Amino acid sequence: MRLSFIIVAVSLLAGGSGAAGAAYPASDVLTSRGTNEGARTGKRSLRYDSNVERTGEEDDEIKFLPDAEKLAQLAKLAHTNKADSLGTSLKNFLSN
């Protein structure tokens, strides 16, 4: 009996019954955005960081960010050291 229900259900779905039809034809559906709408080429920041609002003290996260030269040294250090000795090397590097 279950097999007959499965056969009927498959035949209705494959036959394109009224229940399987779309509520709106595909030609009536419009997209509200283009493919590149909202894409920006500029740098995005998730924080509100304005020079007017700055009080002179920076966040701890921003204060301790390394500059480009220090990041290049860190990348070179990571490239030359093995994974087991990298932890102590990073501690020594960041403590300077």
Curated annotation (Swiss-Prot):
Residues 46-55 have a biased composition (Basic and acidic residues). The RxLR-dEER motif acts to carry the protein into the host cell cytoplasm through binding to cell surface phosphatidylinositol-3-phosphate. Belongs to the RxLR effector family. Induction: Expression is induced during host plant infection. A motif (RxLR-dEER) lies at residues 44-59. Residues 27-59 are annotated as: Disordered. Keywords: Host cytoplasm, Host nucleus, Secreted, Signal, Virulence. It is found in: Secreted; Host nucleus; Host cytoplasm. This is RxLR effector protein PITG_11507. It comes from the Eukaryota. Its main location: secreted. One of its GO terms (cellular component) is host cell cytoplasm. Residues 1-19 form the signal peptide. Effector that enhances P.infestans colonization of Nicotiana benthamiana leaves.
